[in-house]
Amino acid sequence: DPAHAEQYHANAEQLMEQLQALDKSFHDGLKTCSSRSLVTAHEAFSYLARAYDLQIIGVAGIDPEAETSVARLQEVSKQVKDQGIKTIFAEPGTNKTMQTLADELQVKLGVLDPLEAQVDPAQDYLAVMQANLQSLRGGLGCQ
């Protein structure tokens, strides 16, 4: 649509600026965290861990539908206790395994949204990621 090329270019520039600001917010917001360990239901947030120097501990590995073994739950439980982790994270909605793990370990259950199923159409990528940042900051003990 050549007639609107100028508007598309302006929109792209605006989005790039917003994404760069979001990246800076994550870098600045996570650099003072007392914990660098991110315990999640699965490793969907590996990209986030790499980008912001966090260690990912996935309870179920990569596949969110995979059954978690007792051995893996014991391994994660040991890491949480040994590292003094205060919050583990699950996706929005009910995740019985993560809630049970949080209860057994007496830690908080935080929420991280991987944007798989957009529940609220008013929430765009930037808003969801800002909410994720706030959840991470609270759960990882950031100043």
Give the residues covered by each predicted segment.
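Extracytoplasmic metal-acquisition and chelation regions
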Residues: 1-143
